[in-house]
Amino acid sequence: MKHYDLLIVDDERRYADMLAKRLSLRRLTCKVCYNGRTAIDLVGEETFPVVILDLQLPDLYGTEVLTRIKQCRPETAVIILTGHGTEKDREQCMACGAHSFMNKPLDIDRLMDMMARIKERSS
């Protein structure tokens, strides 16, 4: 089984694929999926240290996916990524166990710093 550094979950296929490509240039191995149900299945089958999760997915809202991921893999750091998040959304996600909450467009350098801190903490 291949080891992945992170799972990207976003229904905007072009954005998700572009993000995976940019992160692969930073030597991160990424798996991408485009809906919440697939994300939940993948997290149940494989271990991802980090999940980047869009809040607004077509099949399940991000907080439901987040809750299920944390039930299955409490050690997984989930970073919420959204283009339309409110302060209430941020508070709800953090209460459900999100590691952090970021707005689109994603700042790759900030994400890389966050990934390094997550890796240090889990070592």
PLM regions with names:
Residues 13-31:
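Two-component/phosphorelay signaling modules centered on CheY-like receiver
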Residues 32-50:
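Acidic, metal-coordinating helix/loop segments flanking the phosphotransfer/catalytic sites
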Residues 35, 61-64:
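Acidic catalytic/metal-coordinating carboxylates
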Residues 41, 63-74:
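Short amphipathic alpha-helix used as the core "switch/output" element in two-component signaling
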Residues 55-56, 84:
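The short loop immediately C-terminal to the conserved phospho-acceptor aspartate in CheY-like receiver
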Residues 64, 85-100:
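Alpha4 helix (beta4-alpha4-beta5 surface) of REC/receiver domains from two-component response regulators
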Residues 88, 106-115:
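C-terminal output helix
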